[in-house]
């Protein structure tokens, strides 16, 4: 089936922001103005199209990345129809994984900020994720109608807190209840939207007298940012600034956005139906099409030969599976982004990571949780497949005749765990299936059975994350479960290097067992580098066929923990010597020898416990600041900054161990009479102080 929309008129964008910036409301307005919805959905009434899960409608937050497609021809129908594939992503830090995997497959992002709250901690997390994947972006400063709205203050925060290079292409006409429209700094006209038809029509007018000077200043800033794109344009501007055409300015700005040199800033009030329409125009004019993005690079099966795929229908098919979702009617839905080529329903493709062929049963275009079946998808498309049996998030799908492995996604390790227990025997049978399904959908969610207690443990990115997954288990799989208290995901590591011998010799008549190794056990130079095993055997002291067995013995100790039963991280283990017996040596003997050497060496290398440290940001009236800081100090917090709040009060930034943050919301509420709020996100792992570590180790040993 031939392509309907040329690839240059595609825009694959994300709508991303911190919680409560009005992101889903913005997306709902996009769906209304592009004709997908004929009625505006609202978050506060639970009718938002993109928040389709029951929990999302009840809580008023976005949990999963919903996908939809719409078409836009411009506010004044000035463009050919552009196809916009939108991923609406969560703002809550517990669902950062959804943002991460969306950024991996998008070409551009609209960052939504609240004109009152400004740049929040979660804004910084999302910004870092966009930086990681070099995604071009524009900013939409929303909620200009709210009390305390200040457009230019948020523009300044983009510079100071995100180290961005913001270039406003609009100014606000008024703010709070006097917000009436925007000033287009390229056309140098004011735009007002018709409230009678919910902003479908608009009119231009002259810039109000009180904003003429300010508009001139920011227009100059915009032009100077644009002409930096080339010496030729700079010379033209310097010789006569009035010579620059609107088209030249827009092309120059677009070029700098695509190079991630500037961030264009727009504004409005999605709730009041103002500004979203002009922001959509900016998406078309300034964000990249798939063909603007450099080719995607992958490797062949050998892992070293690099190959490129271009956004072209004539190249071999390649795609990345970025999300697995469970649909009650069709089973697994595999969301994928096509980077090159074409695939049709019924086609066979290769999963080169698992070396398995998969068949596309049906291909569907998703609109939130509604499906529209389509025959084929082309380079640049985002769609979902039904019928893929063994595909995980981050797997590559490609033409069997031209294998390629695209760069895999990285997922954060969980920082919090709880015990779950089925309420009845019938629930017990269903619970394993439900948890495995949820873990398949969400790579930041882990499930395992505790080897000592036999209990089922689930782990995730925060209390809300686990709470919602348990709730989904109840609603979607009809499983009732009791949930234990949250537990911190501690880790174990070492401070110093040691050399340790490990011997396993057994003679009991007949063939014996013999394994003998020397290991060097060293701490990694940086935190969160995991585990590395190196082989420095020379002269065949240990035959090479036994080396993997030694690694396996070490890995078992690493996953089980030694000090207190927590996983071991940030260690490098090198086998550098040993011996073997021609008859009695075996894989199992060397596995046990490796395990013995590592366990004994680990305890000599000054082992320590690590705990997750959270970045905490509290907004509180100034009257309560002393109490809040004193409480943070009691919780082993380190104050990292104080800022003036956007309204009246202070923002306190602190680094606090996760173990001290359980129940913090209740404590903060009582301290400040409900007038303070806080947010937190995982920052790093740090050593647990000796006195506290000993209590944790002793309690674990008693349990074991």
UniProtKB/Swiss-Prot annotation:
One of its GO terms (cellular component) is cytoplasm. Pfam families: EFG_C, EFG_III, EFG_IV, GTP_EFTU, GTP_EFTU_D2. It is found in: Cytoplasm. One of its GO terms (molecular function) is GTP binding. InterPro entries: EFG_II (IPR041095), EFG_III (IPR009022), EFG_III/V (IPR035647), EFG_IV (IPR047872), EFG_V (IPR035649), EFG_V-like (IPR000640), EFTu-like_2 (IPR004161), G_TR_CS (IPR031157). One of its GO terms (biological process) is ribosome disassembly. CDD domains: EF-G, EFG_III, EFG_mtEFG1_IV, EFG_mtEFG_C, EFG_mtEFG_II. PANTHER family: RIBOSOME-RELEASING FACTOR 2, MITOCHONDRIAL (PTHR43261:SF1), TRANSLATION ELONGATION FACTOR G-RELATED (PTHR43261). This is Elongation factor G.
């Amino acid at each position: 089936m031939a392509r309907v929309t040329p690839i240059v008129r595609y825009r694959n964008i994300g709508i991303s922001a911190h919680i409560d910036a009005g992101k889903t409301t913005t997306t709902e307005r996009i769906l209304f103005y592009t004709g997908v919805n004929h009625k505006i959905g609202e978050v506060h009434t639970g009718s938002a199209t993109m928040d389709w899960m029951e929990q999302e409608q009840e809580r008023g937050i976005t949990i999963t990345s919903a996908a939809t497609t719409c078409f836009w021809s411009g506010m004044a129908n000035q463009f050919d129809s552009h196809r916009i594939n939108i991923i609406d992503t969560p703002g809550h830090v517990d669902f950062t994984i959804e943002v991460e995997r969306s950024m991996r497959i998008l070409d551009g992002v609209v960052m939504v900020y609240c004109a009152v709250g400004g740049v929040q901690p979660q804004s910084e997390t999302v910004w870092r994720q966009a930086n990681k994947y070099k995604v071009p972006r524009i900013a939409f400063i929303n909620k200009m109608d709210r009390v305390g709205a200040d457009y230019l203050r948020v523009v300044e925060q983009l510079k100071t807190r995100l180290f961005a290079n913001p270039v406003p292409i609009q100014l606000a006409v008024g703010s709070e209840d006097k917000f009436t429209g925007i000033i287009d700094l390229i056309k140098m006209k004011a735009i007002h939207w018709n409230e009678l038809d919910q902003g479908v029509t608009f009119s231009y007018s002259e810039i109000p007298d009180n904003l003429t000077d300010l508009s001139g200043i920011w227009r100059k800033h915009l032009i100077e940012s644009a002409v930096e794109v080339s010496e030729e344009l700079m010379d033209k501007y310097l010789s006569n600034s009035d010579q620059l055409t609107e088209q030249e300015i827009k092309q120059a700005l677009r070029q700098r956005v695509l190079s991630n040199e500037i961030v264009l800033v727009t504004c409005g009030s999605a709730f009041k139906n103002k500004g979203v329409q002009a922001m959509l125009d900016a998406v078309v004019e300034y964000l990249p099409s798939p063909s603007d993005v450099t080719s995607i690079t992958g490797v062949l099966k050998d892992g070293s030969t690099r190959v490129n795929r271009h956004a072209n229908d004539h190249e071999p098919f390649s795609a990345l599976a970025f999300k697995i979702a469970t649909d009650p009617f069709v089973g697994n839905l595999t969301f994928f982004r096509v980077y090159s080529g074409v695939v049709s329903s019924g086609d066979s493709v290769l999963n080169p990571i698992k070396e398995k062929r998969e068949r596309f049963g049906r291909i569907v275009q998703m609109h939130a949780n509604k499906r529209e079946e389509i025959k084929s998808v082309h380079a640049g498309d985002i769609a979902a497949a039904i019928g893929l049996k063994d595909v995980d998030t981050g797997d590559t799908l490609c033409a069997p005749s031209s294998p390629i492995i695209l760069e895999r996604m990285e997922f954060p390790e969980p920082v919090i765990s709880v015990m779950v227990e089925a309420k009845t025997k019938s629930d017990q049978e269903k619970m394993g299936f439900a948890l495995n399904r949820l873990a398949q959908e969400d790579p930041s969610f882990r499930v395992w059975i505790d080897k000592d207690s036999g209990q089922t443990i689930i782990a995730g990115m925060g209390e809300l994350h686990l709470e919602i997954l348990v709730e989904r288990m109840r609603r979607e799989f009809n499983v009732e479960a009791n949930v234990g208290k949250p537990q911190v995901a501690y880790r174990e590591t070492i401070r110093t290097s040691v050399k340790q011998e490990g011997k396993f010799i057994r003679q009991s008549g007949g063939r014996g067992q013999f394994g003998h190794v020397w290991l060097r056990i060293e701490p990694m130079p940086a935190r969160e580098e995991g585990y590395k095993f190196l082989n420095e055997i020379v002269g065949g002291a240990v035959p090479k066929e036994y080396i993997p067995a030694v690694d396996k013995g070490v890995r078992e100790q690493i996953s089980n923990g030694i000090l207190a039963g927590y996983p071991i991280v940030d260690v490098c283990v090198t086998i550098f010597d040993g011996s073997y017996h021609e008859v009695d040596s075996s894989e199992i003997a060397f596995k046990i020898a490796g395990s013995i050497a590592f366990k004994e060496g680990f305890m000599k290398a000054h082992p320590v416990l690590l705990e997750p440290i959270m970045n905490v940001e509290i907004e509180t009236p100034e009257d309560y600041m002393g109490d809040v800081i004193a409480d943070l100090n009691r919780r082993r917090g380190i104050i990292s900054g104080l800022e003036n709040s956007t309204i009246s009060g202070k923002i306190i930034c602190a680094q606090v161990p996760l173990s001290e943050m359980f129940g913090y919301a209740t404590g903060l509420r009582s301290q400040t009479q409900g007038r303070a709020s806080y947010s937190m996100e995982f920052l790093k792992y740090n050593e647990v102080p000796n006195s506290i570590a000993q209590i944790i180790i002793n309690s674990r040993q008693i349990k074991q």
